[in-house]
């Protein structure tokens, strides 16, 4: 039995590992949509460092010394926008993404009415993960490169 990952706030020193895991995790999405320019793949190390510095919250998941996942959340008014949920490909399907999602929601749940995120409309595994955690598709959009996106939301229980 493997111990659960340690979920903790990211530090500036984590930025390189976050970017490495993020790029590895999003490669399958790039292949699925034939788009090597997805924002998680083109983001720079300086941009990841800026994200870690705030005002958004960035959490990491570690198994021992290895960073195996991360997620970000940014609050705008009464909505918390979840983004860049990434898990190392060899660790996917083990509950790490769900743990990161629950942990990042808990950070801001007392301050917002709902969570919002988007994922590729054809990303069945991602959609299943989010739906298992209470998110529902509320619409569709396209990114600047024409990739079709599913927009999902989840109300915060007993708020608003």
Residue ranges and their predicted role:
Residues 6-20:
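A short beta-loop-alpha structural element at the N-terminal edge
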Residues 20-49:
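Conserved GNAT-fold acetyl-CoA-binding loop/helix
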Residues 46-60, 81:
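A short helix-loop-beta-strand connector motif used in the catalytic cores of GNAT acetyltransferases and
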Residues 87, 93-106, 128-132:
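Conserved acetyl-CoA-binding loop-helix of GNAT-fold acetyltransferases
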Residues 108-119:
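Conserved GNAT acetyl-CoA-binding A-motif
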Residues 130-141:
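Conserved acetyl-CoA-binding loop of GNAT-fold acetyltransferases
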């Amino acid at each position: 039995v493997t111990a659960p990952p340690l979920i903790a706030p990211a530090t500036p020193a984590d930025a390189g590992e976050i970017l490495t895991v993020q790029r590895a995790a999003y490669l399958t999405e790039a292949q699925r949509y034939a788009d090597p320019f997805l924002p998680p793949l083109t983001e720079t190390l300086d941009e990841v460092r800026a994200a870690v510095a705030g005002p958004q919250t960035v959490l990491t998941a570690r198994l021992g010394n290895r960073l195996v996942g991360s997620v970000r959340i940014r609050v705008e008014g009464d909505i918390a926008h979840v983004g860049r949920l990434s898990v190392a490909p060899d660790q996917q399907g083990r509950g790490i993404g769900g743990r990161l999602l629950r942990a990042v929601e808990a950070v801001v749940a007392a301050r917002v009415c709902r969570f919002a995120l988007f994922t590729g409309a054809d990303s069945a595994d991602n959609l299943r993960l989010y739906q298992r955690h209470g998110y529902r598709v509320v619409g569709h959009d396209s990114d600047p490169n024409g990739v079709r996106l599913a927009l999902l939301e989840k109300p915060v229980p007993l708020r608003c």
